[in-house]
Amino acid sequence: MTVVVPEEGLDLESQPDDRMRAKALATSAAELPDGYYRSPRIVASFAAFSMNVVATYFVLQASASALPNILQDVGQSENSSLFSTLWTTGQAVSILMMGRLTDRFGRRPFVILTHILGLVGAIVGCTATKFNTLLAAMTMLGVAAGPAGASPLFIGELMSNKTKFLGLLIVSAPVVATNGLSPYLGQRLAIQGSWRWIFYIYIIMSTIAVTLIIIWYYPPSFAQLHGKKVSKREELAKVDWIGIILVIAGTSLFLLGVSWGGQPNNPWNSAKVIGLISSGAGTLVIFALYEVYGKPERPMVPPSLFKDTRGFVCILIISSIMGSMHLSLVIMYPQQVVNIFGSSLKNWEETAWMSATASFGTGAGVVVLGSLFHLVRHIRWQILVGAMWLTAFLGAMSSINRDNKNSAIALSVMTGFVVAWAQDITMLLVQFITTDENLGVAFAVVAAARPFAGSIFTAAFISVYTNRYPRELATHLSSALRGTGFPQGSFSSLLEAAKSGRMEAVNALPGMTTEISSVVSQAMADSYTASYANVYYFAMALGVIPIIASLCMRDLDCYLTDHVPHQLYDRKNAHKDVLEGNSESQPSPIILSMADKE
């Protein structure tokens, strides 16, 4: 049996020697050694990546949910909105850098270095006594989150095309189980113990993960990718350093500006926000022009990717927009739970459990739909149905009000059911259409575009909500107070207190009674209901885009083959040139004949 290599991969102008070695390193599932996927190096590496993914998203979600308690300990800060933003920005930059660099220098050094950086960040976090120190820790942890965000690549490239999702599912299974629990555990640790244990847990898990990586994870090395005639110094000279500087600066400035904007102390028209967004956007425009017209030898984002409109471009659009729709769910739904159902929930634990139902839905969808992906086939129709499903249930989420709590739980689960599955599919599909020597760079563009697009639409979602709520509140409050005897002259004071969202401020007003307070609480919940409905209408409108993109996408079923792009090697064989015939994994006769002709 010969190696199955897709013939129509995106041509990113690879060197002939690199293309030949990529084909030599590839194999098919049938040609792998017996028991390969049960070998210690595979089991240990998969366990390490699984542990890293769990630790990575646990520290983010748990610390974000415990942020009010953390601020009580280290002191309040006007930069509290940056806590998660710096993490997200760090991960986006890390994944984008990972793409081209690991294609050229190998995955192993990047994975080990980012794990070590994560340990340093967690140590800084667990010892922090000032909030700015915590921000530095979250930045380091965000950059260290690159391997977790790139796990569909690192695991997918070790599996055959038709079993990539099963491999990813094995690694993601613990994440599915813990994803919804992380916010709850973060609050419980902060309330009943110490929030610093969030970072301690990360340190424990990440230490085990990096130990397993160092011992067992040996993907193709620099020598295997390029042979022994090419030096790392020569490759470093070809790195697109100008592109790296431009994309890091542009992405960081733009994401910070978008995330900061709309805050009470940073309105959208403030000089700080306008300056960050405009300078970031301008830098990214310069980056794009440089990549197209500067013609770097190893561009960070090859312009030729975008020539494949029915393949790469459609995948990129679907991933970015559905990721943004996912954000509308995971950001807005927990706020809905607090603002609409807060008065009817018994305690913070019940609130935390109800807020996690959307996450439980995403986990269930990954397990159920991911297991069937390669069996159902008809890839673009699967994505089309998923996009229509998500759009329909996001629209249904607009019907949530204070009288249908059970419906809210059910709808949040059903809405989340397809969203993580759809995002994972796009990050696997991009590996189908790319030649094996360029898997990282194509994957990185798709993976990094999600947080970038997500930050833009998140700002838009929040802007829709914050602009709508005061108007809805004035209407509902005025209607609810008729006949209650509340003084008309005090209405403006009541309106301002209600805008804060705090019932303590409402109850502190002169002349406030228990009955009127209850009426105000219900009016506030109804105002929140109407405001969030507009956000879901917006998200539902976005759903038309991935629906159209999935219809335009070409049929990719032909790529569901036994082709395996890369393998893990024994340590003693990890630096041997496969074309010299002394590697543990021998190239196929076809590949050797190609090498002889050269």
Curated annotation (Swiss-Prot):
Molecular function GO labels: transmembrane transporter activity
Transmembrane domains' residue ranges: 42-62, 109-129, 135-155, 165-185, 197-217, 241-261, 273-293, 312-332, 356-376, 381-401, 409-429, 442-462, 533-553
PROSITE patterns documented for this protein: MFS
GO cellular component, one term: plasma membrane
Phenotypic consequence of gene deletion: Results in both reduced growth on complex media and reduced levels of trichothecene production.
Segments of this protein annotated with the region Disordered: 579-598
Disulphide-bridged cysteine pairs: none
Glycosylation sites: N79, N161
Gene3D superfamilies, A to Z: MFS general substrate transporter like domains
Similarity annotation: Belongs to the major facilitator superfamily.
Summary of the function given for this chain in its UniProt record: Efflux pump that provides the dual role of trichothecene export and self-protection by allowing the fungus to evade the harmful effect of its own trichothecene production.
Name used for this protein in its record: Trichothecene efflux pump TRI12
Organism encoding this protein: Fusarium sporotrichioides
